[in-house]
């Protein structure tokens, strides 16, 4: 297959480069357009079919955790998440950043409570309440771990219908 055909099929978004350099090594990245992944979809087969004839045995294929979580039924419509008083209270103290919603919405905080348990969330919140005024940030997420850090809320740049969903980390990715 010609290199030109590969570059045409796997063209990046306008602001992205196909070739990146990391620690002096150059890597070519070929974004693969997939159908919208839904709960129950076999993402292995969908991806395999999409790269068939292009990928080689030496290629590495990376998949976003979001589509893995969606295919596992771990994404939830935000307007269908019943938010507890605890989630409503705690989310007010989450530092808002421009990298994502994280646990800064009542719905995502509720998912964290369900996923990690009230005791762990309350313990993490208590530690954060003590350490944050001392200038120590991030204690909540250190205690809650990667499952809490991976929870994400809806955002405008996500493909519909998942721009109105919150998601948990993938289960056994």
What residues fall within each predicted segment?
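N-terminal and secondary-structure boundary signal
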Residues: 2-173
């Amino acid at each position: 297959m010609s290199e030109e055909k590969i570059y045409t099929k796997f063209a990046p978004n306008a602001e992205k480069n196909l070739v990146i350099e990391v620690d002096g090594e150059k890597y070519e990245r070929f974004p693969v357009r997939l159908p919208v992944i839904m709960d129950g979809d076999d993402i292995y087969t969908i991806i395999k079919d999409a790269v068939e004839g292009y990928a080689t045995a030496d290629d590495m294929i990376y998949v976003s955790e979001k589509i893995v979580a969606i295919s596992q039924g771990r994404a939830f419509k935000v307007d269908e998440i019943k938010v507890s008083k605890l989630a409503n209270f705690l989310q007010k103290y989450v530092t808002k950043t421009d990298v994502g919603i994280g646990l800064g919405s009542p719905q995502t905080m509720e998912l964290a409570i369900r996923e990690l348990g009230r005791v762990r969330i309350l313990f993490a919140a208590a530690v954060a309440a003590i350490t944050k005024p001392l200038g120590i940030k991030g204690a909540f997420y250190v205690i809650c771990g990667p499952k809490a850090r991976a929870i994400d809320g809806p955002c405008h740049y996500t493909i519909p219908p998942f721009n109105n969903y919150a998601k948990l980390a993938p289960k056994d990715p």
